[in-house]
Amino acid sequence: MKQNFNFIQSIRLSTRTDDDFCSNNAIRGILWNIVYFPCDLYADCKDNNVEKIKEYIQHVPISQINHVESNGSTSLHVAAYYGFNELVKLLLKNGASRSIRNKHNLTAYEEARTSTIREIFKRFNDEDRFLSNIDINYEWILVCEETFLQREHFRQQLLKTFARDSTEDLSTKFDTVYDRIKEHYIILFEQENLPQRQQLLIDWFFMNASIEKNPIWIVKAYTSTTDFYKILNRHLAMYVLEYFHPTLNKSIDYKLVNCLIDFVGIFIHSDGLDKLNYVGQCYRGMLMTKDDISQYTIGSQVMNMTLLSTSKQKTIAEIYAGDGQSKLMRQTPDFKLIHFSTVCTYTVRNKHTALDIHQISEVTDEEEILILPFSTFRVTSMKQNDPKKNGILIELELEECCES
């Protein structure tokens, strides 16, 4: 048996394998598991060989699915360009990256032949990316006077971990950070019951970050259609403050905490992300209870512990907040609303508070602006709309506190 396996391993397949040799389906299946050429997938996509691709795509490494051909395009580009709906779905399901640009500087979404194809690229069953529908305290800390001082303290502490003026070479430091994340954080995803292809795709993003010494790959991982952003934000909300606590807690995994600080340091202090700094307005949807609303008084200050996905398009936030769906909101037995659809308008004034990531996002149509942790905003306006109009019920405006 071992002899036969070694014999099969020694066979080098050409792009077009001899038909007689591969007439045996079992042998062909074994060979596909051992050697596979990206150009085969690209050619099969161009020919729309969906059934053939279904037979082997689960065995194709993510790096080969996202291989850039000599003409500058990926398999996803060619499938979208020719309008092959089922094939686009299959590639996306198996880890095709949406953000790769070809030699024309276009993503597969931008080259899509039809509006139907473009719809496939949009997120589905991911209603809380631009929507805060969990416990507000899970995401925000509300303080009256000291919020901005805490923000300054937290960010200065981060500089000690990921300093711009560090004498250590940036690429060396990035390797150290990546290795720590890989060893102590990415491995946790095995406990999250993620689909295998999601795990492989997340690992692919971080592998590229390490190879290229480029933190943009970590941003891409966050924007991907995996559950990476949900898990990271949950951990940030639960544990990131432990890093700043003066006493140790034996129940806390400080390797996890240090990895979370690495993530925040990369997003805030990495020179590689400076070109993405954003100043301006952005929008996010929220589902709020009466108790939540009562905390957002004019003049109150809030500081976020997590990464917040917002959009330059107000309509995106309105859709996620349930605009026009008030009749479907959670209600009491006597038909009084429990959840109120809310749209927050954030005015970002300082650098290193938000990143404009829509050009590198896996879903460019969302025009995503990412608000970074330890950012402080003051509530400047609250408007309550007529519930009979079945629109957004609460409109909040928040303006970032000035840097000292």
Name what the model sees in each region.
Residues 63-65, 98:
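Ankyrin-repeat inter-repeat connecting loop/turn
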Residues 33, 45, 68:
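Residue-level marker of regulatory loop/turn positions in helix-turn-helix DNA-binding domains and
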Residues 66, 71-73, 77-85:
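Charged, surface-exposed interaction regions in soluble eukaryotic proteins
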Residues 2-34, 38, 42, 55, ...:
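Mono-ADP-ribosyltransferase
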